[in-house]
């Protein structure tokens, strides 16, 4: 089983995440930010990952620390659970519509952290979630997980729909990239390491 459990504590947050890449063994999300919980649930459900998130943060200050630090720990969990990445597909992509919105996510589990994020999020706040932090979350996941991530909203009107489509697309693209392919011998890189 490819799993990881990581706890990260700072003066601002304490985040514990358990991730199971191979079995959707249950999804339990508790960040104190309702919309963010909904997005992480959609990410795990459509990525078919087992995911438990317990995030305690300084929400009285701002949700930014909790959201970004959750991204850091989630990325670290992917990195740890993947190990040496032998036999994985490595690349994954997904287009996900949500009503009038269409999002795309493309990943390369290359060992190199990079983010290209292109989404016009016109509504600045959804419940307790500052929408500008969406990009910070995606960057935190990609950089801590050490992978390339290109995430974009091709079009849409409703900010909730745009962000939800992005989270679902990220889940589906990572599902494709972490999949074991019996035809892949060893590490999927000409360098021999990722």
From Swiss-Prot:
It is found in: Cytoplasm. Gene3D superfamilies: Imidazole glycerol phosphate dehydratase, domain 1. One of its GO terms (biological process) is L-histidine biosynthetic process. It is an enzyme of class 4 (lyase). GO terms for cellular component: cytoplasm. Belongs to the imidazoleglycerol-phosphate dehydratase family. This is Imidazoleglycerol-phosphate dehydratase. It comes from Lacticaseibacillus casei (strain BL23) (Lactobacillus casei). The gene is hisB.
């Amino acid at each position: 089983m490819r799993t990881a459990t990581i706890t990260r504590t700072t003066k601002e947050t304490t985040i514990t995440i358990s991730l199971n890449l191979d079995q959707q063994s249950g999804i339990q999300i508790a960040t104190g930010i309702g919309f963010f919980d909904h997005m992480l649930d959609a990410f795990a459900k459509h990525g078919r990952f087992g995911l438990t998130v317990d995030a305690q943060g300084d929400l009285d200050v701002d949700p930014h620390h909790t959201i970004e630090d959750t991204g850091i720990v989630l990325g670290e969990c992917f990195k740890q659970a993947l190990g040496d990445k032998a036999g994985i597909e490595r690349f994954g992509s997904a287009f996900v519509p949500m009503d009038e919105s269409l999002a795309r996510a493309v990943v390369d589990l290359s060992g190199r952290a990079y983010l290209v994020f292109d989404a016009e999020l016109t509504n600045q706040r959804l419940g307790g979630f500052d929408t500008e932090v969406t990009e910070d979350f995606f960057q935190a996941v990609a950089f801590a997980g050490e992978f390339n991530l290109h995430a974009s909203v091709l079009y849409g009107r409703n900010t909730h729909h745009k962000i939800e489509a992005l989270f679902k697309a990220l889940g589906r693209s990572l599902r494709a990239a972490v999949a074991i392919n019996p035809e892949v011998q060893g590490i999927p890189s000409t360098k021999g390491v990722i």
